Amino acid sequence: IAQCLVGSEMCIRDRSIGCYERTIALLLEKYAGALPFWLAPTQVKVLSITDRAAERANEIRDLLEENGIRTEVDNRNEKIGYKIREAQLEKVPYMLILGDKEVENGVVSVRHRKNGDLGQMDINELLKIMLADVKNKNLEV
């Protein structure tokens, strides 16, 4: 890291940004922060509604991470609307919502960043869709 003193200011770097930085900056500008699924830092956020669904949420995270899907779990004791809004602001491509009904039926309620509510799906069926998006490097946000 190059350092130079100019008056009372200090610049950390005196070179233009590099190739990788320019590419990331271009992608962030083009997609307004809503990166394609395969490129998003957090691809899936699992949101549990009840404490009883928290264990299943962790199991789903483990399954997705075993398959290379970057996943976070939100087991906080907050209203589900608040959790969904927070995930939308973070521009997470998929939100998986788990309550007692979903756990009982062995499904997840799926919300997509762009397409909204996709209804209930089997996690393995959804995983196939996600893996296909990663493999094809789909640019749709």
Positions of the model-derived regions?
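C-terminal structured "cap/appendage" subdomains that terminate the fold
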Residues: R61-M130
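Conserved phosphate/anionic-ligand binding catalytic regions in large, soluble enzymes, centered on
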Residues: R13-L27
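Single conserved hydrophobic/aromatic residue that forms the stacking wall/gate
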Residues: I1-G7, I12
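Short acidic (Asp/Glu) and glycine-rich catalytic loops that position anionic groups and cofactors
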Residues: S8, F37-T42, S109-R111
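Short, well-ordered loop/turn and helix-capping segments at boundaries between secondary-structure elements
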Residues: L26-E29, G33, A132, N136
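Hydrophobic alpha-helical scaffolding
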Residues: R13-I17, T50, Q120
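Intein/HINT protein-splicing elements and their conserved insertion hotspots or analogous self-processing inserts
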Residues: I123, L131-V141
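Generic long, charged, amphipathic alpha-helical segments
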Residues: Y31-R85
